[in-house]
A protein has these predicted regions:
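Hinge/lid segment of periplasmic solute-binding proteins
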Residues: 1-56, 65, 236, 243-256
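Short helices/loops that flank or line small-molecule/ion binding pockets
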Residues: 1-9, 86-94, 183, 194-210, ...
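A ligand-binding cleft/hinge motif common to bilobed small-molecule-binding domains
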Residues: 14-18, 211-229, 241-244
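Extracytoplasmic/periplasmic solute-binding protein
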Residues: 37-50, 55-57, 83-164, 207
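Short glycine- and hydrophobic/aromatic-rich loop-to-beta-strand nucleating segment
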Residues: 55-59, 269-270
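Glycine-centered hinge/linker elements that transmit conformational signals in sensory
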Residues: 86-90, 137-197, 201, 231-239, ...
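Extracytoplasmic/periplasmic substrate-recognition and gating elements
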Residues: 225-313
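C-terminal capping/gating helix-and-loop segments adjacent to ligand/active sites or protein-protein/ligand interfaces
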Residues: 325-392
């Protein structure tokens, strides 16, 4: 995504109503566009969504099938318990270092890793390629890592509303365990991977799983996947170490939060409050072109591989068609965070990877003090209510 077109700015999360951005609901045509996107135009609308993309772990099904020596493994891997997932990831890391026939259990069914490294698995040297809390070259607002809001979705859905420290503690602990698992089993051991590095690791076959948006992965920006790789993409849910006791939200159960991909907004469009009349008119015209014309819709679904804010998708390639079908089959709704919250979450997450000076990378996994500081910072970023506040 480019930073801006005229005075139309592309952001990774909607900004707060602080006077910096135009209220799009004040323009009759933009208000209609906002309503088409499902936004409340009785309130201030600082940005309109560009579109949504599935957020998950992504695998090349040819590699996955070769590794687990079965065409039936995908469904069992999706339905695996946390314990099975943890053991599988650990086993694959050991296998990468020293290939050998090792049995793993997924959804109660046994699979055996191959006794030797075959051609399809020649470059595999780790399990995960995942963007850390850093900004890549395509971050439109230059400040928030692309995956930050989506990463916290499962924890927020488990905690429910109103958001309290008590309800959020268990889900955050569950997310931390998944982040620890990723870090300990990463295909990248030279610091924190950004979006481009993660995508390159997956494209080269170094990593079994890529965590991120499908739209980013199949984009030709950066390390472009081959047509065969794109056609072979399959999703895996991001499995936080949740238990039933961690779920305060009665709308979701453990299987629902553990076994489905997330559908999250990929970017937002906003117009600066100080844009002159001509620039603001041009920016509004660009938004309306996307929202109301066939060519604009095609740009969203066929070029950017997004699901439109009004729910349409593309079937022009296998990956986009799979995404559109999955929206109907079942997804988790992405977290609704504003830009300030997303930036604060990113900063909180950096504390897991950097020492207190914010510059020096930690040598190995973070300690409990860093984890406690992260949880506190996340609570503050999200405005979680404390028990003391509830008592007053």
């Amino acid at each position: 995504f480019e930073t801006e077109t005229a005075d139309l700015v592309i952001l990774d999360a909607p900004p707060q109503d602080d006077g910096t951005w135009k209220n799009l609901a004040e323009n009759e045509l933009l208000a209609a566009a906002a309503q088409r996107a499902g936004l409340d135009t009785e309130s201030t609308v600082t940005a309109l969504p560009v579109g949504q993309s599935l957020y998950a772990y992504w695998a090349d099904n040819r590699v996955l099938t070769e590794l687990l020596q079965s065409d039936a493994a995908l469904d069992d891997l999706r339905a695996a318990t946390w314990e099975e997932w943890f053991d599988f990831v650990t086993a694959v890391t050991h296998w990468c270092a020293e290939p050998g026939a090792v049995q793993v259990t997924l959804n109660g069914n046994a699979y055996t890793l191959p006794a030797e490294r075959r051609e399809t698995l020649a470059n595999l040297n780790g399990v995960f390629a995942a963007q850390g809390p850093e900004v890549s070259g395509n971050s439109g607002d230059g400040g928030v890592a692309e995956n930050t809001p989506a990463l916290y979705t499962t924890a927020l859905l488990a905690a429910g509303e109103p958001l309290t420290e008590e309800n959020l503690t268990g889900p955050l602990n569950a997310l931390e365990q998944e982040l620890r698992l990723e870090d300990a089993n990463s295909a990248w051991q030279a610091g924190i991977a950004d979006l481009w590095t993660s995508k390159y690791l997956f494209q080269q076959g170094n990593a079994l799983f890529y965590r991120g948006y499908l739209a980013d992965l199949i984009s030709d920006s950066g390390a472009a996947l081959s047509s065969a790789q794109k056609d072979a993409l399959v999703w895996l849910p991001i499995k936080n170490n949740l238990t039933e006791a961690d779920i305060a939200n009665q709308r979701f159960n453990l299987a629902g939060l553990m076994n489905y991909p997330i559908l999250a907004n990929r970017a937002w469009l906003a117009i600066p409050a100080d844009a002159d009349e001509e620039s603001a008119r041009a920016a509004a015209a660009a938004v309306l072109w996307l929202y109301t014309s066939k060519a604009g819709e095609s740009a969203l679904i066929d070029t950017l591989d997004l699901i439109t804010p009004w729910g349409t998708g593309s079937n022009q390639n296998a990956a986009a068609a799979m995404q559109a079908a999955q929206v109907t089959a079942g997804i988790l709704p992405g977290a609704a965070l504003d830009k300030t919250q997303a930036a604060a979450l990113q900063q909180a997450q950096r504390g897991l990877y950097y020492e207190a000076d914010g510059i020096t990378l930690r040598d190995g996994l973070w300690d409990e003090d860093a984890a406690a500081a992260w949880r506190s910072a996340v609570m503050a970023a999200l405005g979680a209510e404390s028990a003391e506040a509830d008592d007053n």
